């Protein structure tokens, strides 16, 4: 019901619904709301039998008219640098079909991607997804840790000429039920500081005009009286 409500709201409100890294389920599709397909290290929805990235499966699923953007999840504010595991006991037939994973086995989402491991490989992966999806907007989500690592990504963009369409800056304030409390509360650059860093880096490298910035991670708004 929650996923259906989110997607129905996106449809009614004219905005997009992020799938999260668990893949695209029938519940995401039921109401026809626009989707941002998030792809994490588990590659759910585009996963090979060995657990790696399957380009042909990605091409098939990204062709859906509902999928408007694709987001590569590098890290998240709730648990930056931390992977995840879905115990075998929780892998139901439905989850097996949605995620493309076998029943009876633990499902690992490792801390890092296997499709790339360097900034140059990351931007080349962005290009690969853009080509396979027929030119749909491709970006990545990141919780800033070591500032020099984001600078390295900017340098890779300049060197290759390959730029993401958007970057999602996830503040360290973000949370999730599956995150260890040490990671949730004490790791990751705070949202405002991270936004300033990303804005300044992209501007300094002459990249800002071509890349949209999206802020997430316990982002709230209220009205002052």
Label each region the model flagged.
Residues 110-225:
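Glycine-rich phosphate/ribose-binding loops and adjacent secondary-structure elements
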Residues 1-111, 121:
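N-terminal capping/small domains of soluble enzymes
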């Amino acid at each position: 019901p929650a996923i259906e409500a989110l997607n129905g709201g996106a449809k009614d409100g004219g905005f997009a619904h992020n799938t999260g890294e668990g893949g695209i389920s029938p519940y995401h599709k039921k109401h026809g709301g626009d989707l941002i397909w998030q792809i994490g290290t588990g590659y759910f929805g585009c996963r090979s039998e060995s657990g790696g990235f399957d380009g042909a499966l990605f091409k098939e699923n990204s062709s859906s008219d509902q999928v408007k953007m694709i987001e590569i999840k590098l890290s998240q504010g709730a648990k930056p640098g931390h992977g995840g595991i879905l115990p075998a006991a929780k892998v139901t037939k439905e989850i097996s079909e949605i995620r493309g994973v076998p029943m009876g086995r633990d499902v690992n989402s490792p801390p890092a991607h296997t499709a790339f491991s360097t900034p140059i490989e990351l931007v080349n992966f962005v290009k690969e997804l853009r080509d396979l999806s027929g030119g749909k907007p491709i970006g990545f989500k990141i919780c800033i840790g070591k500032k020099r690592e984001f600078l390295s990504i900017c340098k890779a963009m300049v060197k290759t000429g390959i730029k993401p369409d958007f970057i999602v800056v996830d503040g360290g304030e973000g949370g999730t039920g599956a995150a260890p409390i040490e990671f949730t509360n004490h790791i990751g650059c705070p949202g405002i500081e991270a936004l300033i860093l990303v804005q300044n880096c992209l501007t300094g490298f002459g990249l800002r005009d071509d890349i949209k910035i999206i802020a997430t991670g316990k982002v709230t708004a209220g009205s002052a009286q």
